[in-house]
């Protein structure tokens, strides 16, 4: 009997899929799985002059909602706090650094990828 991959392995697989997808759209990879006590950032990319903090969500089926619907307001707050911490940790001014929050929603084992730019409005 074959074991199902654990959640962490599955998460890494879809994060790498999202990373490759964004790279094909001319984004540059900066960092993956940045952790702090405020939360985690799945991917940090660069789109020209802007940093892009990417939340990757996967759903095998949309029976219980889409992947992007899983980014609750609580999760949004964690992402915002963690991104601000990352900027400060890297010596970047929040006021003078361009950044945004995107969501890459993956469905159907990667057959359907939905990239939502500016999915989370900071503030």
Swiss-Prot record:
From the Swiss-Prot or TrEMBL record, what is one GO molecular function term?
A: nucleic acid binding
User: Which residues, by range, are in coiled-coil regions?
Assistant: none
Name the domain of life. Answer: Bacteria
SUPFAM superfamilies from the UniProt entry: Restriction endonuclease-like
Q: What InterPro entries does this protein map onto?
A: Restrct_endonuc-II-like, tRNA_endonuc-like_dom_sf, UPF0102_YraN-like
Pfam families per the UniProt record, alphabetical: UPF0102 (PF02021)
Record's HAMAP family? UPF0102
| Protein family per UniProt | Belongs to the UPF0102 family.
Report the NCBIfam families cross-referenced here.
PRK12497.1-3, YraN family protein
Q: What is this protein called?
A: UPF0102 protein VSAL_I2655
- Source species of the chain: Aliivibrio salmonicida (strain LFI1238)
From the broadest rank down, the organism's phylogenetic lineage runs: Bacteria, Pseudomonadati, Pseudomonadota, Gammaproteobacteria, Vibrionales
């Amino acid at each position: 009997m074959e074991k199902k991959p654990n959640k962490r392995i599955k998460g890494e697989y879809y994060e790498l899929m999202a990373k490759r997808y964004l790279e094909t759209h001319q984004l540059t990879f900066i960092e993956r799985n940045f952790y702090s006590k405020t939360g985690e950032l799945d991917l940090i990319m660069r789109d020209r002059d802007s940093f892009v903090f990417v939340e990757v969500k996967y759903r095998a089926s949309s029976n219980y909602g889409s992947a992007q619907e899983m980014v609750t307001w609580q999760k949004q707050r964690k992402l915002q706090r963690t991104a601000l911490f990352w900027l400060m940790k890297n010596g970047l001014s929040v006021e003078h650094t361009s950044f945004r929050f995107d969501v890459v929603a993956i469905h159907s084992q990667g057959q359907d990828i939905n990239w939502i730019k500016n999915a989370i409005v900071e503030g």
